[in-house]
């Protein structure tokens, strides 16, 4: 009986792991395709030079020797090989997959849907999509421990062999590439590229925060059991109960502490409204919860 129960637990854990792996694979694929669309249709066609390898690709494409998509493909493949040789086991498979998918998609788009002009004659609209789509895709990848390669691989290599501040080094390289855009494509395009560079990191951070947004509940009530039962049995979350006393009434109270995602938060709020209308609820937004059911330490 114990053996059967153990096998059952192993099967359940295996299925959960497969579901998580498939979900991560789907998210990596979707996020990388979003980045490719934003880069090809809005960044390459407008000659925006912000952001790493693709920004450098726009500059190189101006020479006419190679297209931006092909340069990105070749450079990313070389960086992948270099990363595999130097980093070995530290080289993450997720990064390799996303980098290859991004490079291949850009090359395919160039051949299937060649573009010589932007979609619109509104540069501000174009630059917003050129920033927002790749930033959103990057946020999804960073959130699941992946990246699209490029300068991230260079950063991993440099980090292994030196104590250089990688963040500052990447910012300096991005600024240098963006500034070159002023001389190659003119003041107008250069300013749009500088604008894109200045808000890209801000957008990535905000997208990540939005993806991780959860709700932290402090519920002050006289009867905690029904609420805790709902949290544990219906929402499948944990909760902590603390003894308290009302400062004005002097009556005994209980404080229930719990953290939920946004959908669960709505359900709990509606349940408390129906079950205990006199309860006092404090709800706070939090973008980082570490522990079982959320993010691992």
Enumerate the language-model features and the residues they cover.
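Short, Lys/Arg-enriched N-terminal segments with co-localized hydrophobic residues
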Residues: 1-17
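Positively charged, small/polar-rich N-terminal and surface patches that mediate targeting and assembly
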Residues: 7-10, 63, 136, 170-173, ...
């Amino acid at each position: 009986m114990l053996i059967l129960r153990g096998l059952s637990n192993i099967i359940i854990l295996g299925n959960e792991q497969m579901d998580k792996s498939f979900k991560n694979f789907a998210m990596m694929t979707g996020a990388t395709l979003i980045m490719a669309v934003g880069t090809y249709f809005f960044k390459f066609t407008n000659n925006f030079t912000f952001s790493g390898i693709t920004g450098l690709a726009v500059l190189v494409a101006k020479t006419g020797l190679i297209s931006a998509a092909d340069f990105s493909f070749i450079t990313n493949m070389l960086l992948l090989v270099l990363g595999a040789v130097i980093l070995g086991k530290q080289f993450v498979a997720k990064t390799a997959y996303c980098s290859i998918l991004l490079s291949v998609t850009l090359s395919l788009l160039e051949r299937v849907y060649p573009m010589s002009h932007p979609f619109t004659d509104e540069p501000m609209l174009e630059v917003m999509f050129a920033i927002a789509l790749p930033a959103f895709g990057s946020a999804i990848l960073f959130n699941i421990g992946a990246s699209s390669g490029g300068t991230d691989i260079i950063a991993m290599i440099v980090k292994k062999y030196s104590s250089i501040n990688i963040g500052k080094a990447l910012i300096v390289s991005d600024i240098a590439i963006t500034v070159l855009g002023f001389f190659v494509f003119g003041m107008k395009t250069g300013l749009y590229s500088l604008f894109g560079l200045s808000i890209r990191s801000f957008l990535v951070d905000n997208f990540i925060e939005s993806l991780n947004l959860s709700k932290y509940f402090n519920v002050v009530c006289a009867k905690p059991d029904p609420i805790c039962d709902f949290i544990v049995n219906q929402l499948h979350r944990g909760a902590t109960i603390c003894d308290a006393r009302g400062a004005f009434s002097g009556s005994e109270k209980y404080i229930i502490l719990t953290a939920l995602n946004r959908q669960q938060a709505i359900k709990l709020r509606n349940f408390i409204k129906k079950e205990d209308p006199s309860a006092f609820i404090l709800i706070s937004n939090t973008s980082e919860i570490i522990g079982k059911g959320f993010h691992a330490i």
